[in-house]
Amino acid sequence: MLIRAFIPAHITAFFVPVFHEEPLKAGSLGAGVNLSKGTNVFASIETGTLERHIHVAFNGEPVKREEAEITYYVAEKLVPKDFLGEVEVWQYFDFPNGYGFGNSAGGALGTALALSYAFGGTWLRAAQLAHEAEVKHKGGLGDVIGQLAGGIEVRIKPGGPGIGVTDNLFFEDYKVLVVPLGRLSTREVLDGDVVKAIEVEGRKALEELLKEPKPERMMVLARNFAEKTGLLPGELSEIARELDKVLKNPSSMIMLGKGLFALVRDEEAEKAKQLLSDMNLPYDIAEIYTERPKVGRWVG
């Protein structure tokens, strides 16, 4: 049996981490956007061996347990202890790991949905397990519930699926421009001194967005958040200022990754692509993904 799940890449615009000793009560407030590109997870289940084996691969390359703690945590919970056979989980990412696109959550949620589909379970239980794995292993706090929401989402009550509450912004004709330049460790940022500034500025941004719930306002608030928290490094700030010259809405920093994102329409996208090409910078453009994640039997 081969099961496939697709989870959209998720970019956080601004956030407030909310920690709690119970994983499902931990989460984040904030806002973000889901992309039409993301993580594809294939789960192959074959019976007939004398033992229970679980294997994980990223982009076609097998990985050790310590390199895929979150995925193995999910798989160990969902593959029955008395199952005799081979379970292979293959994760393919459209964006690099560690760049702020919610890959760890995408892998966790995709694995949870695929294995729940195969062995029995529900959407909510699968999503809660993925969130639990993310929180326990410090992969992230709000990506799973954000990916479930689709579109341009706003996290208005913290917590995992079934506890946290999300809303969505209306939008028209926007695509997402991304400029992925490098890695940034969520674990290091959330353990650092910058957390207090994030909490203060993130709550301000959320309050302002709820007063004027529009994508354009979200981008202004996201840029302010990135600058006032000190998260936006000089290199990204310079690129953002150049993009400002050709975009109607400000670009902002991908939270948390060394990169930028912007909401663009077709005419602006062409100008931005030309600018970034002239600057010899990588970029990509994706649609906004408005559905929930997908899962089902794969027939190729």
UniProtKB/Swiss-Prot annotation:
Domain of life of the organism in this record? Answer: Archaea
Tell me the Gene Ontology biological-process terms attached to this UniProt entry. coenzyme A biosynthetic process
**Pfam families in the record, alphabetically?**
GHMP_kinases_N
Give the GO molecular function terms.
ATP binding; kinase activity
Q: Which PANTHER family match?
A: PANTOATE KINASE, PANTOATE KINASE-RELATED
The similarity comment for this entry is: Belongs to the GHMP kinase family. PoK subfamily.
Q: What is this protein called?
A: Pantoate kinase
Q: State the organism named in the record.
A: Thermococcus kodakarensis (strain ATCC BAA-918 / JCM 12380 / KOD1)
